[in-house]
Curated annotation (Swiss-Prot):
This is DNA mismatch repair protein MutS. Keywords: ATP-binding, DNA damage, DNA repair, DNA-binding, Nucleotide-binding. It comes from Borrelia garinii subsp. bavariensis (strain ATCC BAA-2496 / DSM 23469 / PBi) (Borreliella bavariensis). It comes from the Bacteria. The keyword Chaperone does not apply. Pfam families: MutS_I, MutS_II, MutS_III, MutS_IV, MutS_V. Coiled coil: none annotated. SMART domains: MUTSac (SM00534), MUTSd (SM00533).
Length: 862
């Protein structure tokens, strides 16, 4: 094999050694060829015919259709190295080839590979010297940011992986094996970097060189605290794979965690904020309900808002003011929505232009967007809307770009640069189009000058253009005619002008293409000079599109403006679940419900049957709270909502087989996270905690969780349960709620309406009956239930410690009332009494047993 290998195959093998983890698209003429294992793998994934040549497996795709094949490989989380011919066909020896880029899921910039409404993130995670940081980049939008994890880093890491849903992750090998292997990361492409690649000095040098700065302090970093290592990992990865495609990255956003509501990964999933838990699409998510934006930029900003609710009341109210303006000015809102249809994704277009990956339509799209920009300014001035953050200099900059594109770029498919923009180009185009006309005009001018009436211009393949003069006219040949050939009956002549005209005509087509491209590149370079203001225009459109969208939806769906306060309250009147209401609108009227939570009464226990709407009610409160924090109106007739620093939502659970965790363990892990991290300003949503174990264990755990929240965390909480015994809890902050039902003979009607009283029955057997269980099973279940109820003795809660509302008892509760201990004592006493056979003891023995019971009770009470 080594002896018989061709120079081209040797070239391929040398390149493959450098890109072992990528599928090489090896350019051969008008095809990209793949060889060996690459060919075998690609043929399966792309459904290509696998062939062999000299025992080398191979397959290929045409160059002009290669994008679609590359896109499919990226969807399979594969890396694709594009290897192009670097020399022309006239060179001697084998063609030179080089890898011009490595396309991976996280560094896509081609619009054909991207989703309009979703950012395409590459993420890097660093734990260098125990300075934990998380950096992210969307190369297509020039978004680069970093977060410092100063505490609770693992919980924040899980949150951010869910929030950003990166296509690709870069991480050190040590960090991966220490932490990331604990997570289910099968959906991500992982790049593990050897620890020795993480060098502080090299990182500083690399970042300084890219941003052309003297020190990292100008970016907001302390060089002695290497949180910037994750930024270095991103820059290095892109430089190695995409050569010079970092030119569009000119700033770093350093995110302040305390400015945003904390939504852990479990809460994001359980509330189905941006994707559902069935097929993981956006349908049936909160995002799908709130997304009627007209621009791709607005759609992405909406997703960002939903996953990053803000905590500053002033900032929230500013957003709400803007939404209210468009809510009240619906005619303006509809005009803007119509205009925004003409705005393409200029955020990504600007990035492509900076990276020199532009085409003509990109500039035409910018021109259209900027025309809308001027329209919006006029409309805002007319309606006295004061959100306009562009100064005169920036407006002039936008005008320059608009008029440059408008005067230069043609919207005709026949040309790139408009006529009239460049005189030299116009002349070349005229020459190309009117070659025969110019030849005829020149011929006529020479006829007049020479007075040779039969003077002709002819053309041959060998001699090109020439004048032909017959013998009778030799004496009239002008002095500037240069003889080139003598024939028997005529002579052929050339002139300097004819030679020049011929050269111009022959080169006209190539010259037009080359010169147009030169002018086009100059225009692109001029547009890039205004990239900062153009990015600001893109951000402006995204925000206005979003608040216009919120105003439109508020009017359409009868949402109302929430009032944000600094108090610990959630007051909702006639509230609805935004997602359920949206998707069942044509089927039934959604039942409106109230919520009354304040500083004094902040823990709601919700009981009632399955199917009655408990889970819907829980999510409804959480989603409305979140909507208020992103600046949206909410589905309620009235809403007062205290600023909420964190939302925790533990609803449902399933086995984590990959980690060997049962449903119950998953449930307890999630609950532990809530109890560790919730604060008095948080909102806790818990549904059926404790159901995954025995009744006694589950009831005891649920009780102790409620006790802990009431006494120590004091967060606003909604706790749905089928443990009806818990409704007997006596605490001043405790509220009993239940879902109304109505009996109609043997049937139940679920009214899905909340009321302030406990429910005494879960009606599980009724639900089983309407689900279609056999009648014998239902009858038997009813009989067993009656038997169990007839045997039920004292309330479980009678044996649990009193939950005091008096703050003086808190320390005693901390030190002396371990619920698990008390529960064990209760069970021990219960078993002791249950084992007494009262039919076979003497009076003396009964007195002795009674004495033992009294002593046990006294010892347990001491």
């Amino acid at each position: 094999m080594e002896k018989n290998i061709t120079p081209m195959m040797r070239q391929y093998l040398d390149i493959k050694k450098k890109y072992k983890d990528a599928i090489i698209f090896f350019r051969v003429g008008s095809f990209y060829e793949m060889f060996f294992d690459d060919a075998i793998e690609a043929s399966k994934l792309l459904n290509l015919t696998l062939t062999k040549r000299e025992n080398v497996p191979m397959c290929g795709v045409p160059y002009h259709t290669s994008k679609e094949y590359i896109r499919k490989l990226i969807l399979f989380d594969k890396k694709v190295a594009i290897c192009e011919q670097a020399s022309n066909l006239t060179s001697t020896g084998p063609l030179e080839r080089e890898v011009v880029e490595v396309i991976t899921p996280g560094v896509i910039v081609d619009e054909d590979f991207l989703n309009d409404d979703v950012n395409n993130y590459l993420v890097a995670i660093s734990d260098y010297k125990n300075y934990y940081s998380f950096s992210y980049i969307d190369l297509s939008t020039s978004s680069l940011g970093v977060m410092f994890y100063e505490n609770s880093f693992f919980e924040k890491l899980k949150r951010d992986l869910e929030k950003y849903s990166p296509k690709e992750i870069i991480v050190s090998e040590n960090f991966y094996y220490q932490y990331l292997h604990k997570l289910n990361l099968s959906r991500f492409l992982i790049n593990r970097v050897p620890a020795w690649h993480l060098d502080k000095d090299i990182a500083i040098k690399t970042i300084k060189e890219h941003f052309n700065i003297l020190g990292l302090s100008s970016l907001g970093f302390d060089e002695e605290k290497p949180y910037y290592i994750s930024i270095f990992l991103i820059i290095n990865h892109i430089k190695n794979n995409l050569k010079n495609l970092l030119s569009n990255i000119d700033k770093i956003d350093i995110n302040n965690d305390s400015s945003y509501m904390f939504l852990d990964d479990v809460t994001q999933v359980n509330l189905e904020l941006v994707k559902n838990n069935n097929d993981f699409s956006s349908q049936y998510s909160l995002y799908s309900v709130l997304n009627d934006c007209k621009t791709a930029m607005g759609k992405r900003l909406l997703r960002e808002f939903i996953l990053n609710p803000i905590l500053n009341i002033s900032e929230i109210n500013t957003r709400l003011d803007h939404v209210e303006f468009f809510y009240k000015n619906i005619s303006l809102t509809m005009t803007l929505r119509e205009a925004f249809i003409n705005i393409w994704d200029i955020e990504r277009i600007i990035s492509r232009i900076q990276m020199k990956r532009y085409i003509k339509k990109d500039f035409l799209f910018i021109e259209k967007a900027l025309s809308v920009f001027f329209l919006v300014k006029k409309l805002f001035d007319k309606h006295n809307f004061d959100y306009w953050n562009f100064d005169k200099f920036e407006e002039d900059s936008v005008s320059k770009v608009y008029f440059l594109i408008n005067s230069a770029i043609s919207d005709s498919s026949d040309e790139l640069i408009k006529r009239g923009y460049d005189l030299k180009l116009d002349n070349l185009k005229d020459l190309k189009i009117n070659a025969n006309k110019y030849i005829d005009e020149y011929l006529e001018s020479e006829r007049i000058l020479s007075k040779i009436n039969n003077l002709k211009i002819r053309k041959t393949n060998n001699r090109g253009l020439f004048f032909e003069v017959t013998k009778s006219n030799y004496s009239q040949v002008p002095s500037h005619f240069m003889e080139s050939q003598t024939l028997s009956s005529s002579k052929r002549y050339k002139t300097e002008k004819l030679i020049s005209l011929e050269v111009d005509i022959n080169n006209a087509e190539d010259s037009v293409v080359a010169f147009e491209q030169e002018i086009f590149d100059e225009i692109a370079a001029n547009v890039v000079k205004h990239n900062k203001v153009l990015k600001k225009v893109a951000e402006f459109f995204a925000y206005i599109d979003l608040v216009v969208n919120f105003g439109y939806l508020a009017k359409k769906n009868e949402y109302k403006r929430p009032v944000l306060t600094s108090d610990k309250e959630i007051f909702l009147d006639k509230s609805r679940h935004p997602v359920v209401e949206h998707y069942v609108k044509n089927a039934e009227i959604f039942t409106e419900n109230f919520v009354r939570i304040n500083k004094e009464r902040h823990f709601c226990l919700i009981t009632g049957p399955n199917m009655a709407g408990k889970s819907t009610y829980l999510r409804q409160v959480a989603l409305i709270t979140l909507m208020a924090h992103i600046g949206s109106f909410v589905p309620a007739s009235k809403a007062l909502i205290g600023i909420t620093d964190k939302i925790f939502c533990r609803i449902g659970a399933s086995d984590n087989l990959a980690k060997g965790e049962s449903t119950f363990l998953v449930e307890m892990n999630e609950t532990a996270n809530i109890l560790r991290n919730a604060t008095e300003k948080s909102l806790i949503i818990m549904d059926e905690v404790g159901r995954g174990t025995s009744t006694n264990d589950g009831l005891a755990i649920a009780y102790s969780i409620i006790e802990y929240i009431l006494e120590y965390i004091k967060a606003r909480s909604l706790f749905a349960t089928h443990f009806h015994e818990l409704s007997a809890i006596n605490h001043k902050a405790f509220i009993n709620l239940s879902m109304k039902i109505e009996k109609q003979g043997n049937d139940l009607v679920f009214l899905r309406e909340i009321e302030e009283k406990p429910s005494l029955n879960s009606y599980g057997i009724y639900v089983a009956r309407i689900a279609g269980l056999p009648l014998k099973v239902i009858d038997r279940a009813n009989a067993i239930l009656e038997s169990l109820l007839s045997r039920k003795g004292s309330s479980f809660l009678e044996f649990l410690p009193y939950i005091s509302s008096d703050s003086n008892d808190k320390e005693a509760l901390k030190n002396d009332t371990d619920v698990n201990v008390k529960l064990n004592e209760y069970l021990e006493l219960k078993n002791f009494i249950s084992n007494i056979d009262i039919n076979n003891i003497t009076p003396f023995q009964s007195i002795e047993l009674l004495n033992q019971i009294v002593l046990k009770v006294i010892s347990q009470s001491s």
